[in-house]
Amino acid sequence: KIDAVVSDLNGESHTEERTFSISRQSLWISNSISDVEELADFKEFKIYSENISGSHIDATVEYEIFKLEEPSHATVARLKTADKQMYSREEWEKLCPALGYGDENTLEKRKIVSSIMKGSVNTADTTPIAIGKKVKFTTGSYRIIMKAKDKDGNEITDTANFRIADKTSDKMPYPMPSYFALSKSSAKVGDKVQVRFGSSFSDVTVFYTIQIGKRDLE
């Protein structure tokens, strides 16, 4: 950021500022996939390519979506990970099976199980990438890896993790301590909105509050 203050002949000050960025790469790639996608609605997605200023530039992007390994059971994330573990993972799971050992809930640490779909797209074509009928997504955790080359031939890689849930199913989409979903994010007067709660734990009590502004309805 550069700030310039100039005084004119009348002694009045005028301020002007400009911002700029410096980067080792001239291309950024991203996608339109949300952190949590609804199974029935996940039929297409887009891939974007931009320069450092955020302006669109055409690029050929290779992409691949992978299914990730799920934990064997749900765990609650610890408030703070120990600097040094005094127990092995196996010992900890026997002592505190519901309390995470460290990285169980971190998607970035999950192993890849299988490749679901892959392809290549030129971002000059703004048509969304359709998920074919032969591609079978299920509820769970996924990872998309995208690769492209900038104008200097440097390879750019972007990785994003996401989950797929099914609001029509009575089963948990994946092992987790709590699950909350709405049938719609907005509604008109007289409409009905279904609220779904879930947990992989048994004998769970749910406390909830419905508010309008700061006033509690329920």
Where are these regions (language model features)?
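A structural signal for beta-strand and strand-to-loop patches characteristic of beta-rich domains
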Residues: 1-218
